[in-house]
């Protein structure tokens, strides 16, 4: 009996050490994942002020003869095309929900999609005549808040505006990034895995975001003929390169240097 008892004790000790090691590994993995999400949050906050945003006057020059809803449709179409391109490039990598060390491809997708959607949100606020008050830093914080909450900013309610990149905004951003990383890709059919899935999911999510923001902005929309003269938006010192389409061209007016549909004369920057 003694040898058997000793063997049982050794087996129990081994199981205990294995369980302890597993728990420790899970904790270390969780800590690394949280650190990766925190880094992504800071990265998005860092690039947000560099996103080029067209003001209402520029958009009206670029889309002559179109009304607010028609221009908004154009902006959404361009953003959807841009995020689909980002998703198609790294669709397979997005199948890793929360890896111990986040793949560079997945981090690039999240930040790329965020930049395109932040630009969309800012320009939709311009189109609907509800530019958030303040200088670039305050407006950028407001757009980040709108993106993380997937809602429009009500400029008549100061409580909906974040005047600085505080802890509350960072926490909401982390939650939003986590949701994007953990979205329902793992539950899709195996034969759908890959670039097509990344594009389809990003396309769907950007459309959903745009619909929610536009619904909010329509409630507080200011008609163009009732708008006060607004100053031109400040241009970022180091503009972030974004995909160019007829709807997302970052210029100050209509282009006249050739095709605008991605043809051979269109050599603008492309997202990876």
What are these model-derived regions, one by one?
Residues 70-119:
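Long, highly hydrophobic alpha-helical transmembrane signal-anchor segments
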Residues 1-86, 120-272:
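Terminal, membrane-proximal amphipathic helices
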